[in-house]
């Protein structure tokens, strides 16, 4: 499952342009279970888009570190992380409603109270709803690599986007990316290394081993069986 959730084009003031998206809305058919989850669990765990900044302590009912995941696919790894780290809070963004329904269903099954989800364009959410200096971590796992050269501008990891993420991270917060497409990994590394205020957490100044905190997805397991590599990058906001 590829996640592909945001439109990375910005104007000169850093505001998102709406002309080019890095995702295509492929809503697909909802299963009965996904439809049931959207109808019954969205009122509890769903967050509607608005132009008001989120108050995380009010949203989750407590003070706790917040992780934002952009493009959670069907939500399996996001639910696993929220289950494994009950002391932290998680907000996931995904534009495809079947994935949102699947995530809500799994989260309900696990009885999670530390997970909220949104179904909206992530750049708009970052600009309009995420307070500056509020996130402990931002996760972007397996975004669409847009293989063809003429589509490279659609890749979400571009300098303006990485700068936007940095502004939302707390000092010491982490931007964690993963991809199975080596040219995209190289692109991510080039973009992130060019930005003042980020520190690469790799000892070799490139990629990090997969941290135990990131579950291995079915998509990734299949890739390993086929001999595909996976590259993790972790950058800390240091100023």
UniProtKB/Swiss-Prot annotation:
PROSITE patterns per UniProt: SAM_MT_TRMB
Superkingdom of this protein's organism: Bacteria
GO cellular component assignments: tRNA methyltransferase complex
EC assignment: 2.1.1.33
Keywords: Methyltransferase, S-adenosyl-L-methionine, Transferase, tRNA processing
Transmembrane segments: none
Pfam families assigned: Methyltransf_4
Disulfide pattern: none
Job description of the protein: Catalyzes the formation of N(7)-methylguanine at position 46 (m7G46) in tRNA.
Name of protein: tRNA (guanine-N(7)-)-methyltransferase
Organism listed in the record: Escherichia coli O6:H1 (strain CFT073 / ATCC 700928 / UPEC)
Gene this chain is encoded by: trmB
